[in-house]
Amino acid sequence: MFSPADLFRAAVFSMGPESRARDSVRGPELSHREDGSGRTQEQDKPHCPCNHVLGQDCLDGQILGQLRPLSEEEESSGAAFLGEPAFPEMDSEDLRLASFYDWPSTAGIQPEPLAAAGFFHTGQQDKVRCFFCYGGLQSWERGDDPWTEHARWFPRCQFLLRSKGRDFVERIQTYTPLLGSWDQREEPEDAVSATPSAPAHGSPELLRSRRETQPEDVSEPGAKDVQEQLRQLQEERRCKVCLDRAVSIVFVPCGHFVCTECAPNLQLCPICRVPICSCVRTFLS
């Protein structure tokens, strides 16, 4: 069977629960069946003339818009080290990789290892966040290893511990310990956020510029309720056309979401009015 990523690269969107799909630009309908070996056979092949680079996936601008204005209060909401991911919408590595569609070409690292290590792009410069612990890093340099930096700065992340094991994390902590600490409430509003580079010896000021503020205990005064934030994100995932069903189709190139029932009837994005080149069915947890 074709995966959603395969259909996305082919500029094809789903037409429902049956094994049918349609090229959103030229319109020929596809169907497929499986033989005894489980292999899929195509009956028609569309030819999308879109100049958009389909290898660069798009994400919902509504959801990313919620992630961009990350204040210190939001970061101290306590989602980091709970047993559940802070942003389950990014649980899929494919969706995390899709968030790097506007990843700067000057960044010192490719998106694939970042997505594999649990990070998604926030849409700002080379800033990334872990979907599970909410830890953020930036200022990536050539030769940086995402797993190593994840273990260095956010060693209590459960996704990291399950993926790489406690021995790996302890080894990284032993060889590259964090030196110094600071009180988040004393940090200036315009402080530079994270970098995975090794911290300078014993300087809280330099450390402050090298890491996104690590979430603190949820009981700290002024901390926002994590569950309320997630509830608001769920509300953002409601289709803006019918205002009823949950979104499940993402438009290319704009990245906005609508539901499966509304998508086939649209030629322009109802949110930004950009012509729709293609659509892809998404599966959000």
From Swiss-Prot:
Residue stretches of each BIR repeat: 96-161
PROSITE patterns in the record: BIR_REPEAT_1, BIR_REPEAT_2, ZF_RING_1, ZF_RING_2
What subcellular locations does the record give? Nucleus; Cytoplasm; Golgi apparatus
> What are the GO MF terms of this UniProt record?
cysteine-type endopeptidase inhibitor activity; ubiquitin-protein transferase activity; zinc ion binding
- Superkingdom of the source? Eukaryota
Main EC class the enzyme belongs to = transferase
Region feature Disordered, mapped onto this chain: 18-47, 184-225
What assembly does the database describe for this protein? Binds to caspase-9. Interaction with DIABLO/SMAC via the BIR domain disrupts binding to caspase-9 and apoptotic suppressor activity. Interacts with TAB1. In vitro, interacts with caspase-3 and caspase-7 via its BIR domain.
Return the protein name. Baculoviral IAP repeat-containing protein 7
Where does this protein come from, organism-wise? Mus musculus (Mouse)
Its lineage reads: Eukaryota, Metazoa, Chordata, Craniata, Vertebrata
Gene from which this protein is expressed:
Birc7
